[in-house]
């Protein structure tokens, strides 16, 4: 079972970003590459229980500080204790595992 939290309210996103280890999948329903990434992201959420996995549909959230740098989707961002530590566009499963392993 996936442990991904869908976020659609800016205040909720602000609160969740303060966690120790957070990974966010920014995408959109109309994005083909996002649909390919989604089951991988969901699977990884069950394998890394100490990381908070979030999904944000960029069309359903107001402009947020974290979305200002997004130029392409899917974009994955990693936050540690409220600070962005990494951003990667259209990652594959190997790349995601590597960055998740680096958070340990």
From Swiss-Prot:
Q: Which cysteines are joined by disulfide bonds?
A: 31-34
Pfam families linked: Thioredoxin (PF00085)
Keyword Metal-binding on this protein?
no
Q: Which domain of life is it from?
A: Eukaryota
Note the Gene3D superfamilies from the entry.
Glutaredoxin (3.40.30.10)
Site (Contributes to redox potential value) location in chain: 32-33
- Report the residue ranges that make up the Thioredoxin domain in this protein: 2-104
Q: Which keywords does this Swiss-Prot/TrEMBL entry list?
A: Disulfide bond, Electron transport, Redox-active center, Transport
Catalytic residues as annotated in Swiss-Prot or TrEMBL? 31 (nucleophile), 34 (nucleophile)
* InterPro entries (alphabetical): Thioredoxin, Thioredoxin-like_sf, Thioredoxin_domain
Similarity section: Belongs to the thioredoxin family.
Q: What does this protein do?
A: Participates in various redox reactions through the reversible oxidation of its active center dithiol to a disulfide and catalyzes dithiol-disulfide exchange reactions.
Kindly provide the name given to this protein in its UniProt entry.
Putative thioredoxin-4
